[in-house]
């Protein structure tokens, strides 16, 4: 597989024996009106005017985790830390990792290098001030790293981040790098660890295997089979991701969106919570820092 120059691999990450078959459980903490698909309808300076459902939905996520006895990583917007610090503190109090999702869910390729630096530094500082813990990980809004952002990993490292999970090696109309490495690797010249979202190679294509709308769309048995296939054949952790709003079928409905956007956002929301609860019981899950960094620090 040909790697893009800006994603030159220094070396692959190798799972320590202690990692076993533990998979990475990740949650991107943003609300239903903050997703990239709705940004043409909802100005960021109007976010406080919308009904925010983050507290109740994060509570539901944490309750599911507690019932299953699992811990995970939460990529949290700095905006959430500013407006709902008690939510962030509960996440930490229950033993989960807090990582950064930027300040206001602005895609990296829509920022200049200086603006990106300011954004991720501010978000990290806010999250550390709220939690009293070092923030080590970052995830870009909407997987927004590509050839337009060759400076991004270097800036992340300079800002103090130790890993990124910002690349999805799939073909998609809004994001995705199908030719990117589909394994965790250290980025050459930056030194930071990049942990792509999980895909499964079938019929010459990378299929999205672990999270988001794909998990809602595919039958649970198929999703579970794809994840187990990754773990079994490639001997690496699965990186699963979702959002708190996906547990909320009663969320307010957006108007003025295309049929495709409506389908992608709302399909099978009512089935997501029981599916997630089952998945948490069926596979072994953990925090990204403990899996990939050994929680050293």
PLM regions: where:
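Surface-exposed cleft-lining segments at the edges of enzyme active sites
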Residues: 207-217
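Catalytic alpha-helical scaffold of carbohydrate-active enzymes acting on polysaccharides/glycoconjugates
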Residues: 2-203, 222-297
